[in-house]
A protein has these predicted regions:
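N-terminal targeting or signal-anchor segments and their processing/structural boundaries
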Residues: 1-596
């Protein structure tokens, strides 16, 4: 029977009043203590049969948590939170610990994560020993660990990739609580109300129940930053470009030496700002990029077996993924082009026009929307790095009293994209502008020039925008706020200054906000590290989605500690939705199981 003592049998049969089935038993059913060998769990008619493969531990409470895995066979209605407990000794441990696991960065509930406890309070227990008691989170991120004995515990979260019940791989997502967990239970009273009708109370009944604490543990899960440095991949996607991909950012460029070509001034290197993990090399020299195979040595910093950065040199052979065309294919292309040219000339003669061979231009994508935001700017993105820029051929004009007049602007290379340039100007609200670039203003490294460009646009007026101002309390001295759209994507970021986070010139729409306590002041969210007992930087959500209208200001008071973390993120922003509510079984079914 449930709660049996001195049990020695490894095969357990639970019988129900009607035919049942199991839904995803491998995912939903959790057994404590965790089993090294996977148990066999089957449904058969009105029965569930569990066969444990591990040797039973003496004087141990075993709990089998079915979550909502048991369903009636006809309609699939779940039996919620069904559990089964027995002991191999003379005492059964009956306390429980509950809580919620959230993604530390965006406070999303985390489904299917293992949560475990250790009575061994050493930090090394999490990285060397299997959990003693375990639970698993549901679609709301909620977990319950049952069959807990009195005492002090450490609690952890783990996405257990290798199913060994401890943290053994740096790629595993983890969580840990700084404070000790001390389970307890007490008797409490609740009141159930019986109604005569929708307006009249019949009876208020008092019911005693057992309350288990703590039931509000919050675990913020994260993945540690992988600092192991190695070359993941090298490739040459086209003859004129090759790339290197590293597993972690570095502070300096690797040293490249050509073995069948001269590398001196042979490349333009496209790299992100700051620390480097992805490098694109554009080959300048046509004699080099026409080679089928590029042989080179690459010296870079590599993490050795002692976790130290040491120089390492790899010899590489890079072959273009695009197959070079054969002489026969090139000859066919030339013949086809000559035929098309002759056809175009004859057509021009027939129409009495002079034939002009079309010019091939360097492609450029110009971002200059017809309606320009006050804070926005023009950008030009090219398909290859530029060899030259003629600044004098770029013109920005404002329409003043029906005349187009030149206005000052800054033309600046983009800090993140080698092939993008930005045009900044102090826009006059509500005014019209034209942006023009003469032909041949830009030349790519492979010789092509750009065509002329002309874009006209009008700048929005201030009354087309709204503003949101947050009065923030409870934040650290270094904090910033991300303004979010309805899809939880960052629209804009501002620092918290004098307990204020102000957002100006916002387009009408729905917004929410996320605050990050930026402990190291680097302007980005940083993950945690278990070895250093460093939690990820704290994230808090404003609890509402705000609807902003044009020409309207919203001022919101925001105490980041007003609500528990699991109650902060607005439901409409959450991507992890609770499983669809199903019709629940009669609660009497909870007690209908009999052990045989």
């Amino acid at each position: 029977l449930p709660g049996a003592l001195n049990n020695s049998r490894k095969k357990i049969t639970i019988e129900f009043d009607e035919f049942i089935k199991l839904d995803k038993p491998g995912e939903k059913i959790v057994i404590s203590p965790p089993q090294v060998q996977q148990p066999e769990i089957k449904s058969n008619g009105k029965k569930v049969v569990i066969t444990l493969k591990d040797t039973l531990k003496p004087d141990m409470t075993y709990s089998i948590d079915f979550a909502d895995a048991i369903q009636d066979n006809n309609e699939g209605n779940p039996l919620p939170d069904f559990g089964f407990t027995f002991s191999t000794g003379s005492v059964i441990d009956s306390m429980a610990v509950s809580g919620t696991v959230l993604n530390a960065f965006n406070l999303e509930p985390v489904k299917g994560m293992l949560v475990g406890m250790h009575s061994n309070l050493a930090d090394s227990a999490f990285t060397t020993l299997p959990f003693e008691r375990v639970g698993r989170t549901d679609s709301r991120g909620r977990f319950t660990i049952r069959g807990v004995a009195p005492g002090e515990y450490r609690i952890y979260g783990l996405q257990d990739a290798d199913q060994n019940f401890y943290y053994s791989q740096p790629t595993e997502v983890i969580a840990f609580e700084d404070s000790l967990i001390i389970p307890s239970m007490d008797q409490r009273m609740r009141f159930d109300t019986l109604w005569k009708d929708s307006l009249t109370i019949d009876t208020i009944m008092e019911k005693m129940y057992t309350h288990y604490s703590p039931d509000d543990v919050i675990l913020r899960c994260f993945k540690e930053l992988t600092l192991s440095q190695r070359l993941i991949k090298s490739e040459r996607p086209e003859p004129r470009k090759f790339s290197f991909y590293f597993s972690a950012p570095a502070d300096s460029l690797p040293l490249l030496k050509g073995l069948n070509f001269d590398e001196t001034d042979a490349f333009i290197v496209e790299k992100p700002t700051g620390r480097i993990d992805t490098l694109q090399y554009w080959i300048r020299d046509s004699l080099v990029y026409q080679m089928d195979t590029l042989k080179m040595s690459l010296t870079y910093l590599y993490t050795d077996t002692l976790n130290q950065l040491v120089p390492r040199t790899d010899t590489l052979k890079l072959v273009s993924k695009l197959r070079p065309k054969s002489e026969k294919e090139l000859e066919k292309e030339r013949e086809k082009k000559e035929k098309e040219l002759e056809k175009a000339k004859k057509k021009a003669e027939k129409e009495g026009k002079e034939y002009v061979e079309p010019t091939v231009f360097l492609p450029v994508d110009v971002y200059a929307p017809g309606t320009m935001d006050i804070y926005d700017y023009i950008s030009l993105t090219f398909t290859e790095p530029l060899a030259s820029v003629a600044d004098s051929t770029i013109h920005l004009k404002q329409k003043i009293d029906s005349l187009w007049r030149d206005v000052p602007f800054d033309f600046i290379p983009d800090s993140l994209n080698l092939m993008r340039y930005n045009v900044y100007a102090d826009w006059e609200p509500g005014e019209s502008y034209t942006f023009e670039v003469d032909s041949t203003a830009f030349q790519g490294i492979y010789g092509l020039f750009t065509d002329k460009v002309k874009k006209e646009f009008k700048v929005k007026k201030p009354e087309e925008y709204g503003q949101i101002f947050f009065d923030v309390s409870g934040a650290d001295s270094l904090a910033f706020v991300d303004l979010l759209d309805a899809q939880d994507k960052v629209v804009r970021t501002v620092p918290v200054v004098n307990s204020r986070a102000d957002f100006y010139f916002l387009n009408p729409g729905k917004y929410s906000a996320r605050l990050i306590n930026d402990r190291n002041g680097n302007g980005v969210w940083d993950t945690g590290k278990y070895e250093d007992k460093r939690q990820p930087e704290e994230v808090y959500y404003y609890y509402q989605v705000l609807e902003l209208k044009a020409n309207f200001d919203l001022t919101q008071s925001w105490n980041i500690h007003d609500r528990p973390l699991d109650k902060q993120k607005p439901g409409e922003l959450k991507k992890q939705k609770p499983d669809e509510d199903k019709k629940k079984k009669n609660q009497n079914n909870r007690n209908s199981g009999n052990r045989r």
